[in-house]
From Swiss-Prot:
Record carries keyword NAD: no
Boundaries of every LysM domain copy: 35-86
UniProt-listed NCBIfam families: PRK14125.1
Superkingdom of this protein's organism: Bacteria
Name under which the protein is recorded: Cell division suppressor protein YneA
A single GO cellular-component term on record: cytoplasm
GO biological process: division septum assembly; DNA repair; negative regulation of cell division; SOS response
CDD domains associated with the record: LysM
Amino acid sequence: MRKTLLHYVLFSFLFALVLAGFVYASSPVDKKEYVTITVAPGDTLWGLAKQYEQEHHMPPDEFIRWVVDVNHLPSPRLAAGEQIVIPVLKSKQGGSVAVNQ
């Protein structure tokens, strides 16, 4: 009986933890808090991930996935002149990030 109760409590805790993770992961991003840039000819998401790596501290593949998801891009390809939000907080940009707004 006691073992069953322990399993029930443990299962409930794990379920709540997983559910909280899904809710947090699906929370919308407030784009106003992040830097918006204008894509220059020849820019790639991989190149932007490397260019801004000191400001976002994400692996390049995570940076690319974030940009594609938040900007609702149909593919990871960028077009010159396109404006995209990148995972660099405006409050953290200091003087080191060149921002095109």
